[in-house]
Amino acid sequence: MTVTAAMVKELREKTGAGMMDCKKALAETNGDMEAAIDWLRAKGIAKADKKSGRTAAEGLIGIASAGAKAVVVEINSETDFVARNDAFQELVRGVANVALGTDGSVAAVSKATYPATGKSVEDTIKDAIATIGENMTLRRSAMLEVEDGVVATYVHNAAGEGIGKLGVLVALKSSGDKEALNAIGRQVAMHVAATNPLAVRSSEIDPAVAERERNVFIEQSRASGKPDNIIEKMVDGRMRKFFEEVALLSQAFVMNPDQTVEAAIKEAEKSVGAPIEVAGIARLLLGEGVEKEESDFAAEVAAAAKG
């Protein structure tokens, strides 16, 4: 497969590696971008936290809650200008509130009735596109609910009540004091916003993700030239560290790095007055995994001048 300049550029942006290293990585992996990232990591040239690449979609994240149930939605727009528009912000809040009455899936939210218009959310967004003059889409949504407990929420970079660039839900099961439970839940939600854990517990991490990390660690360890039995111990140690870093409960608590999140929750049980279980987390970062289409600015100006 021919390695193009655009492919090299994309890999450089995702990894921070040099141009020649990126070109070699793509050649070695037959142009497979993810495999090329792993190749660079195995050589110690790229770090895992660079893999996600750039995010560039505009819009807002909206959150709505009702104690033991909460939802988070992402509505994208083409420009940040529209995201600052009062009508758009009200639309995001409204869709989040409508989502509370559904199972939280995009399909269910889209079909639900939007009270202010009497139409479906999908048709209401279409009407908003015509009114505001810019394309919009309900891209993602998530819902968490517990029978006895709270779903704490947190919005980072808030643009107003319940809307912002990053939204987090943390579901806590407990029969204890709900106000105290929500307080620790909000702290954990802020932690999730900052650290982006892959799962609540290490046992819940996608086996494919864990296997991929193990393979990278094996290649890195082999470069040391040590015997296989030593390499196996090195890899096991790195995997333990990996799980500690990406599983919520084993992470160092942002509010107090001297204790884990699990220890902080255990400590909070004293004020809550009952055991606490983390039932789930949801984290939506605006535009995550979306890249704006690159454009030629000079060509845009020329086209505008002709128009």
From Swiss-Prot:
One of its GO terms (cellular component) is cytoplasm. InterPro entries: EF-Ts_dimer_sf, Transl_elong_EFTs/EF1B, Transl_elong_EFTs/EF1B_dimer, Transl_elong_Ts_CS, UBA-like_sf. The keyword Protein biosynthesis applies. Associates with the EF-Tu.GDP complex and induces the exchange of GDP to GTP. It remains bound to the aminoacyl-tRNA.EF-Tu.GTP complex up to the GTP hydrolysis stage on the ribosome. It holds the Pfam family EF_TS. One of its GO terms (molecular function) is translation elongation factor activity. Its main location: cytoplasm. It comes from the Bacteria. This is Elongation factor Ts. It is found in: Cytoplasm. Residues 79-82 are annotated as: Involved in Mg(2+) ion dislocation from EF-Tu. SUPFAM superfamilies: Elongation factor Ts (EF-Ts), dimerisation domain (SSF54713), UBA-like (SSF46934). Belongs to the EF-Ts family. Keywords: Cytoplasm, Elongation factor, Protein biosynthesis. CDD domains: UBA_EF-Ts.
